[in-house]
Regions:
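Pyridoxal 5′-phosphate
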Residues: 1-251
Length: 251
């Protein structure tokens, strides 16, 4: 996803870091051996999605983290799709960072959640300066506040935080197990229907699939399909899904 790739691209420009890509297989999964073969003694970070918003693949974050940590590598997880669609246990996953987008959990826009292990959050410098994130300010020195205030510069988006709390309550009232069960039923039904049409090509057949089912229709532009379905009251996402590199790979 561009949100995971573009920041690293910025660092490639400013810090001259090297970015490598682990290849997907024909099912849309990233086998752990494909990740392992890209690792060298210089590898510092593995940044990876938990649930692909293109193929629907749920990646084995726990196993990937175990591999990474055995080699002293930090694991950063894009959990924007995983947050609302998977049962999460950070202690079990053991990743170093996990990022969530609140609006994908029925919350407000412009707000996100970053889980990070305390040892890293204490070591890393603030990414932004302002009021609220400092402990003491003198002419010649500044000391930063304790966690999490160290990373909360400026006026907090209080209304959005309160709204997101209500979103969490809403999801908890449904139960993540019920969400997963319902999505599984919808995906299986969708696959059953779409496979009957020879003009439809399903994208990806991952070992473990989240609530995403992607497809193309032979001879019809995706935006036209989206428009036609919209007229019947069905909303779908058409385009490159903010994943142009993956779309290029899939053809």
């Amino acid at each position: 996803h561009h949100s995971n790739y573009v920041p690293w691209h910025f660092l490639r420009k400013s810090k001259n870091i090297k970015i490598k890509f682990a290849e997907i297989n024909e099912d849309g999964d990233i086998p752990i051996e494909n990740i392992e073969k890209e690792i060298t003694e210089k590898t510092k970070v593995i940044a990876i999605t938990h649930l692909s918003n293109v193929t629907g693949a749920v990646l084995p974050i726990k196993e990937i983290t175990q591999l990474a940590h055995s080699k002293g590598i930090v694991v950063v997880v894009d959990g924007c799709q995983g947050g609302p669609h998977l049962k999460l246990d950070m202690q079990d996953l053991d990743c170093d960072f996990y990022a969530i987008s609140c609006h994908k959990m029925y919350g407000p826009t412009g707000l996100g959640v970053l889980y990070g292990k305390k040892k890293w959050l204490e070591q890393l410098p603030p990414y932004q300066g302002g009021g609220g994130m400092i402990n003491e300010v003198k002419k010649d020195r500044i000391s930063y506040g304790d966690l999490p205030n160290k990373y909360e510069a400026g006026t907090m988006a209080t209304a959005q935080v309160i709204a997101f709390n209500e979103s969490i309550k809403f999801l908890e009232s449904i139960g993540i197990e019920n969400v997963i069960k319902h999505e599984k039923e919808l995906i299986e039904y969708g696959q059953e229907i779409l496979k009957k049409n020879n003009s439809v090509k399903l994208i990806g057949n991952p070992k473990e699939r989240g609530g995403v089912l992607s497809f193309t229709v032979e001879g019809v532009h995706p935006h036209d399909i989206a428009t036609i379905l919209d007229e019947t009251g069905v909303a779908i996402r058409a385009g490159h899904h903010c994943c142009q590199i993956l779309h290029d790979k899939l053809g």
